UniProtKB/Swiss-Prot annotation:
The active site is at H140, K545. This is Phosphoenolpyruvate carboxylase. The gene is ppc. PROSITE patterns: PEPCASE_1 (PS00781), PEPCASE_2 (PS00393). GO terms for molecular function: magnesium ion binding; phosphoenolpyruvate carboxylase activity. Its cofactor is Mg(2+). Forms oxaloacetate, a four-carbon dicarboxylic acid source for the tricarboxylic acid cycle. Pfam families: PEPcase. It comes from Ectopseudomonas mendocina (strain ymp) (Pseudomonas mendocina). One of its GO terms (cellular component) is cytosol. HAMAP family: PEPcase_type1.
């Protein structure tokens, strides 16, 4: 196995040493020796030493209740420190003889390929400037790290960057080491787990913090690099107002199954976003006013400021006053219903115009080098983030809209909307949408649930259009689901177009997505209300939970193909919104490969996707890493637009049909039909305990019931904690196994080599199987599962083994990830620290279940820390 980079090893070792010193100072040599025995036992056990495994098990088993929490914290902290070192390694300064990382050279190489393929330079520049990519930041119940700790981790990363300079004096190196020691001690002495669930507003503030501390710096850096790449390839530059990647958010807008997200919360989050945006621009404008002291200005700028000796400062002073007014109003409006004054900025144009005027004037007066400095960065931010920072989506379940309309139609004496068939619903909705009179009489008094739905619609109607993204309808299944929301918004006073987006998330709904959109686009009057592309959201999480990833992936692909075809027939542009999670079981995986594996024609210059809580931190938490990931998105969407993959061969489609059919039967045969499955799941995993932990503002369940009532995130998170990773692979072992046994290996190998969709699926499957660990899953069974259910656990581990064997046969390797030794080494290094946490977690679960601990007890706290540590060690968790 290739050794991980020596510098990375040195840094991991350094951070581990400093953590050890911190632990020794607080808890003494004996305790640190115990930690070291556990670590060495885990390492020896991984190398096949029975004595090492025995040492690990006995040392952990002998721990007293008072020792469980500090042991869990030690391994949790180490995994977080290893993550920091690994992230930092990805962006560290290269030596002159080292190539740039793929993430930074990907756009340059793509532009060369596109020009070689015959793209005209001006068309290429135009297409790059027109790209419309939106990353939608979502809250995440398994993002367990507190914001306080994330800030400390970022500071540790900054010190590692400083340590990277080869010309440091010994005294400077010593100062950095002392600062690192202090930061690690601060992290160790900070409680890593919050005592109470975050509110939706807390979650939104967490999202704003990522923008403030990372994306605010990363976006202009990323656009500078894209501009340089374009100029080097074509001689042309990105337009000043180009914003190929923008950001939206679900934090404070996603009320699906979360009663804590109310209309009041949505209003508060919208105001906080405006406050934060104004505050960030004020910092920029203060810096610009200090720098732009020049006297020479264009006639256009002079017309705005007269004969001021410092015309740029005079113009920026006007903007600064308006930004202060905006921030002050947003602050006051949080506690009182105050109308914005005339000076409050309401339109992005009012923010951009003075900045553009300064920029154009500087260029006109021969000071382009000054214009292209911080002023250009501020302009890029203004084009990307605007006055509202992120566009807030609203999401609600279709049943809530139907219930509200049922109550209204019942009150009006029209019968119950929920009991009508689709034709009756559509006739009623179209009639009311065309009517000029209000639907609701003034004396109508709605129930609490209906009042909340209507209040949300009123907030949407009252908010500026640029503050909002889409209104997403979860569990959509019919054209009437979309019209229902349009009617409720009309009733709330909305007089402008709003994107109302059906989310298709079960297998049946994905198969029905084409007919629903076909019906919708054919309805009289619908196209008039559309204004722009038809947006459709594809759900990855619930379809995989419903049918397994084999059938779900193929259903998602086919649904997209059908939507592309139908929108083409109707001559309507299509925007696909991908509801991906962080894990393979929820559609996660490397974004670049995922985008390039979409059906031909489905990207077409537009791409919208969710970015999940814990993945936001890993992909966008540090400016340099954020820049790399933004580069990947830009290059992938440009490539998928201009060099789309070929349509799959008929034989490949037929094979995928067979794989999906076998896969869904195998998956449901276990998850839905095995009589012991639910009982086994609840005993073998921390599923029940996860519901009690303060991990997010949203409940883990939609309602009482079995697996089907669980949300997709805790369903996957529970299996990840035990390393069985079942949702990501179950079904593939039968599907691939049968095809290979039937002599279809050559066809499968051709599909993997020539079809990006299939290659990406197999690559992600291989990655998750490499992280899965049957021996760890067996330990949970031995400690937690009653004997009558243990044979099912053994059967599932056998299926895991079959899945691994099938992937190895298909890829022609002797071990998983043999082609990626760095990834294998990374998993191997983490296992040394993960193994004790898994054993400890199984022990904690056993003790907690035996004694029914209170949430604040040391045992419950230790359990929560073990959950956080395993999540940190495995990265993409739920």
């Amino acid at each position: 196995m290739a050794e991980i980079d020596a510098r990375l090893r040195e840094e991991v070792h350094l951070l581990g040493e400093l953590l050890g010193q911190t632990i020794r100072t607080q808890l003494g040599d004996d305790f640190l020796d115990k930690i070291e025995r556990i670590r060495k036992g885990a390492k020896a056990g991984r190398r096949g030493s029975a004595a090492g495994a025995e040492q690990l098990t006995s040392t952990l088993g002998d721990l007293g209740d008072d020792e469980l929490l500090p042991v869990a914290r030690a391994f949790n902290q180490f995994l977080n420190l290893a993550n920091i070192a690994e992230q930092q390694h990805r962006v560290r300064r290269r030596r002159p003889d080292e190539p740039e990382p793929f993430e930074l050279r990907v756009l340059d190489e793509l532009l060369e390929r596109l020009l070689a393929a015959g793209q005209k330079p001006d068309e290429l520049a135009r297409q790059l400037g027109r790209l419309d990519i939106e990353l939608v930041l979502t809250a995440h119940p398994t993002e367990v790290a507190r914001r306080t700790l994330i800030q400390k981790y970022d500071a540790i990363a900054a010190q590692l960057t400083a340590l990277d300079h080869s010309d440091l004096l010994p005294a400077e190196r010593e100062r950095i080491a002392q600062r690192l020691q202090r930061l690690i001690a601060e992290a160790w002495h900070t409680e890593e787990i919050r005592r109470s669930r975050p509110s939706p507003v807390d979650e939104a503030k967490w999202g704003f913090a990522v923008i403030e501390h990372s994306l605010w710096q990363a976006v202009p850096q990323f656009l500078r690099r894209a501009d340089r790449s374009l100029q080097a390839a074509t001689g042309l530059r990105l337009p000043l107002e180009a914003a190929p990647i923008r950001f939206a958010s679900w934090m404070g807008g996603d009320r699906d199954g979360n009663p804590n997200v109310t209309a009041r919360v949505t209003r508060e989050v919208l105001l906080l976003a405006r406050w934060m945006a104004a505050d960030l621009y004020l910092r920029d404008v203060d810096q610009l006013a200090a720098e732009l002291s020049m006297q020479q200005a264009s006639a256009e700028l002079r017309a705005q400021v007269g004969d001021s000796a410092e015309p740029y400062r005079a113009l920026l002073k006007q903007l600064r006053e308006r930004l202060r007014e905006t921030r002050s109003w947003a602050q006051q409006a949080l506690t009182a219903d105050i109308a914005p004054g005339a000076a409050v900025l309401q339109d992005n144009h009012d923010l951009l115009a003075p900045l553009q005027l300064c920029y154009q004037s500087l260029h006109a007066c021969g000071m382009g080098v000054i214009a292209d400095g911080p002023l250009l960065d501020c302009l890029r931010r203004a084009a990307t983030f605007g006055l509202f920072l992120v566009r807030l989506d609203v999401r609600q379940d279709s049943t809530r809209h139907a219930a509200a309309l049922s109550e209204i139609t019942d009150y009006l004496g029209l019968g119950r909307y929920a009991e009508w068939d689709e034709e009756q619903r559509l006739a009623f909705l179209q009639r009311e949408l065309d009517s000029r009179r209000p639907l609701l009489p003034s004396d109508y008094r709605p129930s609490a649930d209906t009042a909340e739905v209507l209040a949300t619609c009123r907030e949407v109607a009252a908010a500026p259009a640029a503050a909002l993204g889409s209104y997403v309808i979860s569990m959509a299944g019919a054209a009437s689901d979309v019209l229902a929301v349009q009617l409720l918004l009309k009733e709330a006073g909305l007089r402008r177009p709003m994107r109302v987006v059906p989310l298709f998330e079960t297998l049946a709904d994905l198969d029905n997505a084409g007919p629903v959109i076909d019906r919708l686009l054919g309805l009289p009057g619908y196209r008039v209300r559309l204004h722009g592309p038809q947006e459709v959201m594809i759900g990855y999480s619930d379809s995989a939970k419903d049918a397994g990833t084999t059938a779900a992936a193929w259903a998602q692909y086919r649904a997209q193909e059908e939507l592309v075809r139908l929108c083409g027939e109707h001559q309507v542009e299509l925007l696909l919104f991908h509801g991906r999670g962080g894990t393979v079981g929820r559609g996660g995986g490397p974004a670049h490969a995922a985008i390039l594996s979409q059906p031909p024609g489905s990207v077409a210059g537009r791409f919208r996707t969710t970015e999940q809580g814990e993945m936001i931190r890993f992909k966008f938490g540090l400016p340099d890493i954020a820049e790399q990931n933004l580069n990947l998105y830009l290059a992938a969407v440009l490539e998928a637009t201009l060099l789309p993959p070929p349509a799959p061969e008929p034989s490949w489609r037929a094979m995928m049909d067979r794989l999906a059919d076998v896969g869904v039967k195998a998956y449901r045969g276990v998850v839905r039909e095995h009589p012991q499955f639910v009982a086994y799941f609840r005993q073998a995993t921390p599923e029940q305990e996860l519901g009690r932990l303060p991990l997010g503002s949203r409940p883990a369940k939609r309602r009482e019931g079995g697996v089907e009532s669980l949300r997709a995130i805790p369903w996957i998170f529970a299996w990840t904690q035990t390393r069985l990773m079942l949702p990501a692979w179950l079904g593939w072992e039968q599907a691939l196994g049968q095809a290979l046994a039937g002599g279809e290996g050559e066809l499968l190998k051709n599909m993997r080599e020539q079809w990006p969709f299939f290659r990406t699926r197999i690559d992600m499957l291989e990655m998750v199987l490499a992280k899965a660990d049957a021996s760890i899953a067996a330990l949970y069974d031995q400690r937690l599962v009653e004997p009558a259910l243990q044979p099912l656990g053994a059967q599932l581990r056998d299926l895991l083994s079959q899945a691994c064997a099938a992937v190895l046969e298909l890829t022609g390797q002797s071990r998983l990830l043999a082609h990626s030794p760095e990834t294998l080494e990374s998993i191997s290094v983490r296992n040394t620290y993960l193994d004790p946490l898994h054993l400890l977690q199984a022990e904690l679960l056993a003790r907690c279940r035996l004694r029914q601990q209170a949430p604040e007890s040391p045992l419950e706290q230790a359990l929560l820390v073990s959950v956080a540590g395993i999540a940190a060690g495995l990265r993409n968790t739920g």
